[in-house]
Amino acid sequence: MKLGICTSIENSALMKSQGWDFVEENCQNILQGLLNDDEWTGDERASRSALPVRSANVLLPGSLKVTGPDFEETALATYLNRVGERAKSIGIQTVVFGSGGSRNVPDGFDRSLAQSQIKDFCTALAIVGSANGITFVVEHLRRQECNIINTVGEAMTYVLATNHAALRCLVDTYDLWSENEDVRTVRDAMPWIRHVHLADLEGRVAPGLSGKSDYRPIFSILREGNYDGLISVEASQFDIEKDGERVLDFVRTQWQNA
């Protein structure tokens, strides 16, 4: 099990000094799928990181739609191929498909058609992932951020429908708790879980800072399932210099005591 933070690589040296294992960057900063190869600078940025960049989130910009009438298969295919090839070249193992602005179902649009569009997109993710040796993970988002794929259980419907080793499931503690989802769904999804995001429910602060969130029930399920993948802190207003060490200690202690 490796612990990282969703942040810029500019914080990597500080993270390394505190004992973190990796950086989770933003796809729009590091993979830049909208740019041509001669414009891409993410490889140069990654080479300056004091820690490996093992994962990336925010797969899609809001301008690229996965659902609705503005779905453009050709543009998405070009974008995904760039992302896959670039992720492989800099050693990124996991790319997160959250992208609420891209997959949000437009008002009045047929929901079953939107679900079919997402299934097609997930198939495309699996193909690109397989070709480049990376794993895409489907992230559930709370309803305030997106109106589709709001739970682990719902994310799993797309993972199971795709049925491919390059497409797996992410568990996000903040979104899980926000939706009051039973942790038993995590146990059911355990064989397909390949990435984890952490934040307290109260204020979406980094683990332990609110003093009110207990990760042990979820960590217990992960440990029972022999989870040995990446776990990233994805929190609001996380002052890494001030709080990074105690957050890391808190997560490690909760894991050990689960």
Please identify what each model-predicted range represents.
Residues 6-10, 26-30, 56-61, 100-102, ...:
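Active-site beta-loop-alpha junctions enriched in small/polar residues
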Residues 66-168, 178:
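Active-site acidic/histidine proton-transfer and metal-coordination neighborhood
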Residues 39-40, 120, 180-184:
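Short, conserved clusters of charged catalytic residues that mark active-site
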Residues 1-21, 77, 82-85, 91-93, ...:
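Histidine-acidic metal/acid-base catalytic patches
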